[in-house]
Amino acid sequence: MENVDIFNKRREKLENIRERGKLEKNEYSISVHVWLLEEDKLWIQQRSNEKKIFPGLWEQSGGGVISGETSLEAVKRETKEELGLDIQDEEITYIGSYTRVTDIVDIWLVQRIFSKDKIILQDEEVANIKNVTFEEFDKMIENKEVVPTINPSYNLLKEYIEKIV
């Protein structure tokens, strides 16, 4: 299990370092959601059927920020681990954040052309990937094919996209 830095709700770092998942009241870790956008389509990933939480459902890339790591570094590490992608700083845009029960989630957008044959899935995390339009993803949400906690992250992404189009 990885260690994480602990923050208060205002994102001020506390002196504590804990094992992920072992947070006390009013303690938060940082997580990243990484949306991969190629032109007007999203690359999404299907969670491994071996996952304890939401097996087989679809979501964006991402994960927890480990102790000593920045949110941006976590974006690069998670996309490398889960999908075998080397993401460059200039391809990454910070969109915003929101707070859940035990973590603060940073939302990031990576815009580039992805080659499916260059993507290497981390089997224990990711079962499959696919490229979908926003309309197709909305339909997947409606059909409950997507991790149910994704809405705040996805809504921030859509708001950002609407501003830049």
Describe each PLM feature range:
Residues M1-H33:
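Acidic, metal-coordinating catalytic segment for phosphate/diphosphate chemistry
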Residues I6, L36, I44, L109-V110, ...:
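Conserved hydrophobic "DFG−1" position in protein kinase catalytic cores
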Residues G21-V32, L37-R77, E81:
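Conserved Nudix-box catalytic region and its N-terminal flanking loop in Nudix hydrolases
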Residues D86-I95:
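A short coil-to-beta-strand element that immediately follows conserved catalytic motifs
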Residues T99-V165:
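Nudix hydrolase/Nudix homology domain
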